[in-house]
Amino acid sequence: MARTSKAGFPDPVLITTTEDLTGVVERLRREPFVSIDTEFVRERTYWPELCLVQLAGQDEVVVVDTLAPGIDLAPLGVLLDDPEVVKVFHAARQDLEIFLYLFGHLPAALFDTQVAAMVAGFGDQVGYDNLVASLTGAHIDKAHRFSDWSARPLSEAQIAYAAADVTHLRTVYQLLLERLEREGRLDWVASDLAVLSDPATFRPDPETLWERMRPRTSNRRMLGVLRAITAWREREAQRVNVPRQRLLKDESLLEIAATAPADVDALARIRGVSRGFAEGKSGTGILEAVAAARALPDGALPRQQKGKEGPRPSPALVALLKVLLAACCEEHDVAPRLVASSEDLDRLALEPEPDLPLLQGWRRTVFGDEALALKDGRMLLGVDGTRVKRIPA
């Protein structure tokens, strides 16, 4: 019989061999759901370096040492691929990115308790510690939050801390599931989990990453160079497994785009670009990207991101839509962030009926229909005490 901790959970077992991992997976595949978390380091690499995988079933909790010599993680992939076992995460994006990189595809049958908590009225992007405390009354020891998980050996305290991320998660999942079923909101969660099940969510197009830098120019030739060198940096950072900012900072990319250097000497004069970088393979790659962008016909050059040019939404209308969004979400006890973003409200204010999530499914019921009515003048907003009142026009 497995020993249990003071909290009533089985004591965690450290897994360091493929044989033991295979046995764990065989047992966990008989369960309806398994809670999962990871510990990793990423300060020195582009791709996360997976250090631990924590798994919890009904009667066992394991911490898999993914850095143990000779361990093969293929059995873990079998568990992740099993559509009959729900894989429960909290704030799953980074965990899923790791598994996508490791196995080439995403786990089947996902559930994210952070998404579920937003639907269930626990606010925007509620943290795991706060959610555990709200639902179970338990408080998680944070002493090892900033551990170097790549260092070995692991202490018993580190193993216990890592295990707590999946033991309490089982209880949180069950309580949230009951609440969502009772309120008829499971389908609300499903639509957002579909995004997490799409590999494109974790593989941004290198050709669009330049837009994140929000360059303050409408010069299309400069934007074309910026697009080319930003895409080069992303692919090169992935290839050599170095953080993109360590390879070449955004500020340097913007200056390269503005000056479009044509040779090594000009490139080496850019702030943040060393002579060694300019003379090496990386410098050659940058100069080739600049030259290719300079040779593009005008019609192939990018334009500034939407919102930087052209008509702007009415600030007053956007402000009213934000007030209405807050009122609708308070009434339905759902996080506003999950219903509509600021960019969504800007588009709604500008376009007759844009193709946006807020005008589809449950979001339209909660907010979208009323937002259209407000925009079209079929609804007025007033104040009744401390509450926003909607008045048919």
Curated annotation (Swiss-Prot):
Pfam families: DNA_pol_A_exo1 (PF01612), HRDC (PF00570)
Keyword Hydrolase applies: yes
Enzyme class: hydrolase
Keyword Kinase tagged: no
Domain of life from the UniProt record: Bacteria
Any one GO MF annotation of this record: ribonuclease D activity
Cofactors demanded by this protein: a divalent metal cation
Domain 3'-5' exonuclease stretches: 14-181
EC number: 3.1.13.5
CDD domains reported for this sequence: RNaseD_exo (cd06142)
Gene3D superfamilies: HRDC domain, Ribonuclease H-like superfamily/Ribonuclease H
Gene Ontology biological-process entries: tRNA 3'-end processing
Reactions catalysed: Exonucleolytic cleavage that removes extra residues from the 3'-terminus of tRNA to produce 5'-mononucleotides
Compartments where found: Cytoplasm
Keywords: Cytoplasm, Exonuclease, Hydrolase, Nuclease, tRNA processing
Chain ranges of the HRDC domain: 219-300
Function: Exonuclease involved in the 3' processing of various precursor tRNAs. Initiates hydrolysis at the 3'-terminus of an RNA molecule and releases 5'-mononucleotides.
The protein's name: Ribonuclease D
